[in-house]
Structures are given as C-alpha cells and as structure tokens.
C-alpha cells in the first residue's frame, strides 16, 4: 500500500479539492478521501465543495483498539467535532458551510 507521505510532490487531497470541484462543475458529486482525521477536516472539505469526506483511518484505528465500541466512539467524536466546527462558523447544518467559511492557507 502506498501512502501520500511516500509520494514527493503529490498535492494533498484537500489542496486539490477546489480544482476538482471546479472541473466537475456540478455535473457530479465530489467525494474526497485522504488525510481526513478530524471533524474540522471534514467541515473544511464540505466548505470547499465535497459532498462528503471519507474518514477510514480513524475508523480503522477505532476498530483495532476497541472493536465495534471503538468504531462507535470514533464516529461519535467525529460527529461532535463536526457539530462544534459548524457552530463555530455559524452553521447549523453541513449543507450550510461554504468556501466563505474557509480561511485561505498562509503563504
């Protein structure tokens, strides 16, 4: 298995997302995967136009550590982080977050 950290010069999923969403131009839903570990990562992806962001690694870690209960706890934490992040930017629901809620990266 090859991970992004093993590929020099490859853009992170979140960095490539705006260009992918623009290229899709509403013709299809955009799903994104790779590097999403926290609820804030998911909210950022939604704000940049993704329909959803996959969070496989945290879920797999929860499974490895605590089985079904571990997965449930990881999903609970992600939900709580998403709700908090949405609240902090003044959104009640995930479909309300937009690019205007994302601060551009410095540099």
Task: Briefly describe each language-model feature range.
Residues 1-2:
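Short, small-residue-biased leader/transition segments that mark boundaries at the very start
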Residues 5-7, 61-62:
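Short secondary-structure capping/turn micro-motifs that flank functional sites
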Residues 6-9, 34-35:
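Glycine- and other small-residue-rich loops at beta-strand/loop junctions that grip anionic moieties
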Residues 15-32, 37-107:
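Alpha/beta catalytic cores of nucleotide-metabolism and tRNA/nucleoside-modifying enzymes
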